Amino acid sequence: MSMRSDIGNWRRFYSETFGVSFSIDKIKIPKARPGFPRIIIVGPGLTPDRIYDACAARFPCVRHYMNLDRDVAQDEREAQRAYAVLVRGGEESDPELAAMSAESLRERKINAITLCEYLLYQLKHFTETRTLLDRKHVTMCAGSRYRDGRVPTAISHRGELKLHWCAPDEENPRLRAREVIAQI
C-alpha cells in the first residue's frame, strides 16, 4: 500500500470511526525510512478515553486506570494539532527493543509509541483485519507516562485488549516497545 493511499484510508477511518474530518494534507509526514511502512495519523484533540471508547465499542477491552484522560499525564507528542508518525507495522511490537526499559529507550533517544498512537493503531488494524495486535508480547507505550510515573502497556489476550502498566526501569523479555519516526 502506498503512503498516499494509506493517508486516504486514514481520512475515511476518522470519518467513519469518530465522525470527524480535518485537513490531513497539511500534516507533516515524517521522511520515509526503510522498515517503517505504516503511518499513524493522530487527529487534533483526540484523547486517550475517546480512542479507548471507540476500541471498546468494537472489541473487548479492560484497563487498570479508569480515567485515561486524567491518568495519562505525559506524552512525548500531544494531539493539540494533527500529526503523523511512522511505525514498523508488525502485529507484534519490535523484537529488537525486547527487554529494554522505558528509561533505556529514552537514554538511547529512541522515540517510542504513545498510548494514543497505540490505541489508534490497534483500532485501525482491527478495522482492517478483524484481529488484535500484540497477542504474544506486551507493548510498552514508552512515549507516555501515567501520573504516578508508570508506563502504559498493552497486550491482546484471548481476544481482549488489556491496558496495564510497568515500571519505567522494568526490563522483561516479553516487554517490548514500538519505535516511531516522528516529525513534530
Which residue ranges define each predicted feature?
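A binding-site-centric feature that preferentially detects glycan-recognition modules on secreted/surface proteins
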Residues: 1-111, 115-184
